[in-house]
């Protein structure tokens, strides 16, 4: 089978300016890949709800989706192939460390929440993604959490979080870092999807730190310039 063609969303399929445009040339390229028999896949740090608000699911006949940096995998029709969730204690430790540093954390779960009032880092990230900010709520320690985002200064290394058990911290290009389950990545999600699609290799396109693992395991990888 031909390799899967795997695409990040923000900064790759679409821009990260105020317009958040998907160019006609991108849509045409996806169509031509599909017509040539390549499985086409979205691989994003966005949760499914956030992704669906972009409308990108409608620009091509996608074969599958990898959401939350590999923590949710679905087929092209949205049927769940696999889902990974944080251990509750890992979520609690992350929030406690963020509270010590007066940083906000978004929890992506059934209902997205944020742990403190949005600050300049949250608002800058919201502009970058054109995304929604959840209500301020305290985590109850019970709900399953699919993904976390920590908000901090642009270019910060998030060192205080790097030794926390059970998580992997991936600083982004704006004022945020994605937090994933340790050992789970876009690469592992693509490999899980590939078992269903019957393909064991892929080509990928991405632009940020959460794309590095995906690029390491690809047959070929293309890093976008922003």
Question: What do these predicted regions represent?
Answer:
Residues 5-7, 65-66, 204:
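Residue-level marker for buried hydrophobic side chains located in beta-strands
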Residues 3-19, 215:
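Asp-based phosphoryl-transfer active-site loop
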Residues 65, 202, 221-223:
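Short, well-ordered beta-strand core segments
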């Amino acid at each position: 089978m031909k390799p899967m063609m795997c695409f990040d969303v923000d900064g790759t399929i679409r821009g990260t300016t105020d317009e958040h445009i998907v160019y006609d040339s991108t849509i045409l390229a996806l169509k031509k890949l599909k017509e040539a028999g390549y499985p086409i896949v979205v691989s994003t740090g966005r949760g499914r709800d956030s992704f669906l608000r972009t409308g990108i699911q409608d620009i091509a006949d996608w074969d599958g989706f990898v959401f939350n940096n590999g923590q949710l995998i679905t087929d092209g029709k949205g049927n769940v192939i696999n889902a990974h969730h944080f251990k509750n204690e890992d979520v609690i430790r992350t929030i406690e460390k963020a509270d010590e540093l007066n940083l906000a954390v978004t929890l992506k779960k059934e209902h997205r929440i944020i742990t403190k009032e949005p600050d300049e880092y949250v608002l800058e990230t919201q502009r970058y993604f054109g995304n929604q900010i959840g209500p301020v709520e305290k985590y109850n320690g019970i709900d399953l959490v699919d993904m976390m985002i920590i908000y901090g200064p642009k270019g910060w290394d998030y060192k205080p979080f790097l030794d926390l058990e059970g998580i992997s911290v991936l600083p982004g290009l704006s004022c945020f870092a994605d937090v994933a389950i340790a050992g789970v990545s876009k690469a592992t999600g693509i490999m899980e999807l590939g078992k269903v699609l019957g393909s064991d290799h892929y080509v990928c396109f991405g632009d940020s730190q959460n794309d590095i693992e995906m690029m390491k395991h690809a047959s070929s990888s293309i890093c976008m310039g922003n």
